[in-house]
Amino acid sequence: MLPENLPTDPAAMTPAAVAAALRVDTKVGLSSNEVEERRQAFGINELPSEPPTPFWKLVLAQFEDTLVRILLLAATVSFAMAVVENNAADFVEPFIILLILILNATVGVWQENRAEGAIEALKSFVPKTAVVLRDGDIKTVNAEELVPGDVVEVAVGNRVPADMRVVELHSTTLRADQSILNGESVEAMKQIEAVKGRQERFPACMVYSGTAIVYGKALCVVVRTGASTEIGTIERDVREQEEVKTPLQVKLDEFGVLLSKVIGYICLVVFAVNLVRWYATHKPTKNETFFTRYIQPSVHCLKVAVALAVAAIPEGLPAVVTTCLALGTRRMAQHNALVRDLPSVETLGRCTVICSDKTGTLTTNMMSVLHAFTLKGDGSIKEYELKDSRFNIVSNSVTCEGRQVSSPLEQDGALTKLANIAVLCNDASLHHNAATVQVEKIGEATEAALLVMSEKFANIKGDSAVNAFRTLCEGKWKKNATLEFTRKRKSMSVHVTSTVTGSPASSTNNLFVKGAPEEVLRRSTHVMQDNGAVVQLSATHRKRIIEQLDKISGGANALRCIGFAFKPTKAVQHVRLNDPATFEDVESDLTFVGACGMLDPPREEVRDAIVKCRTAGIRVVVITGDRKETAEAICCKLGLLSSTADTTGLSYTGQELDAMTPAQKREAVLTAVLFSRTDPSHKMQLVQLLKDERLICAMTGDGVNDAPALKKADIGIAMGSGTEVAKSASKMVLADDNFATVVKAVQEGRAIYNNTKQFIRYLISSNIGEVVCILVTGLFGLPEALSPVQLLWVNLVTDGLPATALGFNAPDRDIMEQRPRRMEEPIVNGWLFMRYMVIGVYVGLATVGGFLWWFLRHGFSWHDLTTYTACSDMTNGTCLLLANPQTARAIALSILVVVEMLNALNALSENASLIVSRPSSNVWLLFAIFSSLSLHLIIMYVPFFAKLFNIVPLGVDPHVVQQAQPWSILTPTNFDDWKAVIVFSVPVIFLDELLKFITRRMEKAQEKKKD
């Protein structure tokens, strides 16, 4: 048998037709030879495994970043020059650069291959063994040995080993938990009848690999194995989703490319100018060798160019970005949002569309009865409303026709019977969680809601209120037998016997029935009224009941209704309860007592969260597998829809989406707020459509089926109660499954972006200052004001601490009133870059100014400084000072550090003056500035470090420095140099205040134009 011979739609075929197509006798199974032949054709029944990416490939991938490559090149050239000049101190620079690159690569490799976790989690759902019929014998085999055509037995507690067609039921019903595929907590009823013209993704006559059998026993035929199964399709979809860079990473990469080009051109210009100047000022001599004439000057000019590259590249930027994002994840964790992927923190702040699941995210995932009704003595409807959306048993939570009633069961005999039926036709239970002070359920949500309803009706006060009425009912009635729910009759019932002494013989044995109201009503011949009287069910009664059911199940209510009835019957031994075919006859001639309507209600905080989203310019789109009417009712309650009367262009089903043209789909995703009756493929399709419109999309999900869409979205958000597969495929997990948490995370993401902009502004303006310093000294042929090692120290340590502290800046008050940033919006726009340039140029000129000030103060002329390379007598004191100007460099380095600390204060706010945005608003920044200045003083006044960084302590007598021990701490006695440092540094504050003032004026002018 070949793969092309497999039935394409086994659900639409009868069991006999499926068996014939697969060439198997379901009474005997396949023979051993047939199994072997089919294994050769179809392979083994397991999800495919791909070898992990080799470690060396992961390491190489970390060096694809432009800035990293420039640093690698700078390290290589620097190392080569250190070898040529044979100076041990010169090896410090390439060593530090390589150390940075290794750390970056280590972090990158650690974060790689997130998809493999999701794929491995998928495999955990597939069972290890299966019970199979082969050669007429029942055998237990490894699940991976199954082939199409194998006849497999499944029973309660088993996980399904492959996609199979149900061919025989060995119990009254078969129920499967398919939540890993469809995300729905309601168990799926299974049948052997074919499903033709189906609209459901998972038809009732099929069971699927990885799902669990929760009730019953059946015989099935394997139709799909391995990668061909539904779970295999999900595995393939997850694997095929490529990791895409976040918007922040893209913008940082673009910034890196731009920076690298500018650096490259400037380095070439500086190298060429310095080389030309060298040859212009150095005439060849007879004793000059080729090395001293050509190689040495080239190496020197190259060294200056490399220093310029090191100055221009913000080496600390990746570490600061990572730290800022990590701080954001900590703050998000406090709001129950657990971030698995650091860059995604900022992505959420950019998001323009949030695609949210309904159940459990927008709603409480706690089914609650909101409405119930019985009939009055005059045949009119008696309505009850119940409040509180959770499982809590709230006293006095029932109103009857607008009036609060404290003991409704004492006033309504039909309601008493309804509550008894709801409790006894029930397998769920409630218990009080002392830790959370909440009532929690065990069992189906629908049945738990009925228990809560009954307890609220009984209104029994006390510590045992959570199960008080149930205990009372179970004391009055003995449950003898249960007639399980079947899809055909849409009802279930229990046979009970009264244990109350002296009860009338006619009411000793009863059949309590609950089910679909229309089915229960169809089989009813009598009705119980609120006064306890049982009367004939007239046409008028029937009409009023149907009208009431239509009222609460339709329109904006869309409640799920359940009907209740009972029937006096014989003792259990005299009733035919063994044959499911007779269940409908047993449940006939019923007495209808009433009905209730329930709903998974919206979370109270979600409506406000959606309003915040609107204010922030974020669309909320609900994508659910629930029916359209229920989903629209929830959207109305949340304010996403104004009414359910006309939802044209706002609400679509998955089937309607499939019928659209590509143009219609594009139009739909731009206007719709709801997609109902969707399956996993629709989620994938909607994410792609939104991304095609250049919208940044966040997607929530909890099931295995959601994994591909979660991975495809710009940011996938899994529910804390969801599957491990969904969590592994996502970038964020909501511990409390709450939509309002997403909105808090969006706010945090926006704050992170603003802070990222501020520390990039700080770092880049500082780097521009360093570039200007190197550029000016290089172009004018001045001695080196700053060495590469000093630049690395400033970029990584001195600047790194304040830049990181800027991540603690408080968010702007109007942060959630701003529109989302466009995908193409750069981190740094034109005017902002101009501001960086102005500040950076001042930083550079101030550094060079301080450097020149020292020389000019000590009798050097401009000519001496610009022709210092012509010094040939290195025993001359002037030449020695020009070749190694340690004091001037110490002043230049000090000015650079102090001016950058003051510039960090400027970065507290992009546009607000320091008078408004005071330094005290970020104590971490003040601590960072203090730490950076302390570190600078340590490298200056501890001789060991001063020698390492090739500077001298300012204001300390040279003789004291010469006699000092390497680890002693020196103290300045002359502060003239430090006064100069302050004079050159402080103006940066006033310059930035002027630029902020101009920016505020420009923004006001733009606002006036808009008005």
Curated annotation (Swiss-Prot):
Gene Ontology terms for molecular function: ATP binding; ATP hydrolysis activity; P-type calcium transporter activity
Bilayer topology annotation: Multi-pass membrane protein
Species the sequence originates in: Trypanosoma brucei brucei
Extracellular side: 85-90, 279-303, 795-835, 906-922
Protein name: Probable calcium-transporting ATPase
InterPro entries, per the entry: ATPase_P-typ_cation-transptr_C, ATPase_P-typ_cation-transptr_N, ATPase_P-typ_cyto_dom_N, ATPase_P-typ_P_site, ATPase_P-typ_TM_dom_sf, ATPase_P-typ_transduc_dom_A_sf, HAD-like_sf, HAD_sf
EC number(s) reported in the record: 7.2.2.10
SUPFAM superfamilies, alphabetized: Calcium ATPase, transduction domain A, Calcium ATPase, transmembrane domain M, HAD-like, Metal cation-transporting ATPase, ATP-binding domain N
Matches recorded under PROSITE patterns: ATPASE_E1_E2
Function: This magnesium-dependent enzyme catalyzes the hydrolysis of ATP coupled with the transport of the calcium.
